[in-house]
Amino acid sequence: MKKVLEVKNLEISFDTFAGKVQAIRDVSFDLYKGETLAIVGESGSGKSVTTRSIMGLLASNANVDNGQILFNGTDILKKSEKELQKIRGKEIAMIFQDPMTSLDPTMPIGKQVAESLMKHNKISKKEGLRQALELLNLVGIP
C-alpha cells in the first residue's frame, strides 16, 4: 500500500503569557491509502493540535519545534498558506470533532459536498451534484 501521510517526531509548543507551553512531544505515525485513522485521547492530550498541524491550521502563537509532516512525500510544514489552500478540501480534509462546525444543518449534505467539489475542480453545479451523490453513496449515505 502507498503511504499517503507520515508524521515524524512532531513537537509543537505555544507561546503564552506564562511562557512556552509544550503541546505535543515526539508524535509519529503513518497512514496508508485506504486506511482510516482515529486519533483518540484525553481532553488536552494534543489530538486537535496534531490534526490541525497536518492541515496547516495552527494558531499564530504555535511553534513547530521539531518534526516533519509528509503528505504524498511533500512536507506540509514547508508549504505556504496559498499552497495549502489548494490542497485543503481537495486532497486532504479533516472532520472536526464538533459536527455543528463541520456541516450546515440547514443545507442538504449533498449540496455542501457539491460546493466543495465545484470550488476545487471547477465543474458545473450539475456535475458537482452528480459527483457528490456518487461520493455519498460510496460511504453509505443515501
Please place each PLM-identified region on the residue numbering:
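ABC transporter nucleotide-binding domains
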Residues: 1-142
